[in-house]
Amino acid sequence: IYNQNYYFFMVFSLLLKNGISISKAFDLAIIGLENKFLIFQYKKLFSFIDSGLELSQAFKKIDIFDSLVFSMLSVAMKSGRLEVLSEEIAKYYQQKSENLMDKFLVFLEPMMTLFVALLVLFLALGIFLPMWELSSGINF
C-alpha cells in the first residue's frame, strides 16, 4: 500500500507542477494504481473533492492515511503549495515502504541462513552416510 501511495502522490505532484488542474491530476494519478482497494478509496476521495469538500477533510473521511498526511495536506492547501508538499508526502511513503522492506529483510536473513545450513547438512549426510555404511561392512 505504501508503494502505491508513493506512486499516486509522485504522479499527482508531477502533474500539478506541470499546470494540470487538481481534478484532472487526481484522475490521471488514479489510472496508474494497481491495488483495487486503493483505486476504490481514491475514487471515493475524488467524489468527495468534486462535491466541494476540502482536500485534507476528504482525506480524513477516507481514513486510510496517516495523520501526518492530513496535516501536510492542510498546510499545502493553506499555503498554496500542494505540488511541493504532495512530493514530500510521496517521499514519506517511499521511506515507509523502504523501512518495511528493511524490516522484512532483517527477518528473512536468518531464515535464509538456516535454510542454507540445512541444505549443506542434507548434502553432507548424503555423501558421508554411504561412506560410513561401506566402512562398517569391512572387517579387518
Question: How would you label these PLM feature ranges?
Answer:
Residues 1-105:
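Glycine- and small-hydrophobic-enriched helix-loop-helix hairpins
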Residues 95-140:
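Bilayer-spanning, highly hydrophobic alpha-helical transmembrane segments
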